[in-house]
A protein has these predicted regions:
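Structure-specific DNA junction-binding interface
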Residues: 1-75, 84-98, 104
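C-terminal accessory module of base-excision DNA glycosylases/AP lyases that mediates lesion recognition
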Residues: 1-39, 129-140, 147-217
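Amphipathic alpha-helical segments within well-ordered protein domains
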Residues: 46-51, 64-67, 88, 92, ...
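A broad structural signal for alpha-helix termini and local helix breaks/kinks
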Residues: 54, 70, 119, 143, ...
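Short, hydrophobic/amphipathic alpha-helical patches that form generic packing surfaces
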Residues: 43-54, 110-113, 155, 213-217
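Short helix-capping/linker segments at secondary-structure and domain boundaries
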Residues: 52-61, 115-121, 160-164, 187-191
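Alpha-helical ds-nucleic-acid-binding substructure associated with the helix-hairpin-helix region
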Residues: 69-158
Length: 217
């Protein structure tokens, strides 16, 4: 099977099965939770950071629920009037908003502080009018965001939030457990390493390797 046939098969799979599981177009979030992360760039960033060791719906509903508990969603107020311990306590309060409230409290408070000091309190300034490589580099500077998450963010920003990214060839596939298994079983790569999976995706779809994440997300 040629690369174009593999890509077409994945696109057909996404169209047939992917919509229901899409965090932004499926039924995993309430309308209010979905609208919040799609219209508020800071909520999107918080959801991205929270997407760790929990179900996707738990992570991406967290920003809305945290805002309800805070009574606001101002990055300046979080950075200057709260602490990582206070955020952790809010996350820990039953029903808990995350499996690891302590770590997540530190990550989210740190994100609010960085947004306030470097991006005028608005995450949209991270990805406005810059390349994919710059977006990834900026996102990786935030505690709790790995290269995998930063690559996933680029895909979601383009696919679901309508952010224009010119150099899509620099958006890598997310090194996700499901993708790794499929790539190995399909023989796209021989080893389960970041390097091998990334290079395989670049061979399969050189114009936009990160798109291959989409059918599984």
């Amino acid at each position: 099977m040629e690369n174009k046939d593999i890509l077409n098969a994945l696109q057909n799979y996404e169209m047939t099965f992917g919509t229901a599981e899409n965090i932004f177009s499926g039924g995993l979030l309430t309308d209010a939770e979905r609208d919040f992360v799609m219209r508020d760039s800071n909520a999107f960033l918080f959801g991205l950071i929270a997407d760790q060791s929990v179900k996707a719906e738990t992570a991406w509903s967290l920003p809305y629920k945290l805002a309800q508990r805070l009574g606001h969603f101002s990055m300046q107020k979080i950075a200057k009037e709260s602490s990582s311990e206070e955020i952790g306590t809010l996350l820990r309060t039953k029903p808990a908003l995350h499996r690891y409230p302590g770590n997540m409290g530190r990550y989210l408070w740190s994100a609010a502080e960085r947004l306030t000091s470097e991006y005028d309190g608005c995450a949209e300034n991270i990805w406005g009018n810059v390349t994919a490589m710059e977006i990834v580099e900026r996102l990786e500077a935030f505690s709790g965001i790995s290269h995998k998450k930063a690559s996933l963010a680029c895909l979601l920003l383009w696919r679901d939030l309508g952010v224009e990214i010119s150099d899509k060839e620099n958006i890598d596939i997310a090194y996700d457990v499901h993708i790794r298994r499929i790539f190995l079983r399909a023989g796209f790569c021989e080893k389960d390493t970041l390097k091998d999976v990334t290079e395989a995706a670049r061979r399969l779809n050189p114009k936009f390797p990160g798109y291959l994440t989409s059918p599984f997300w």
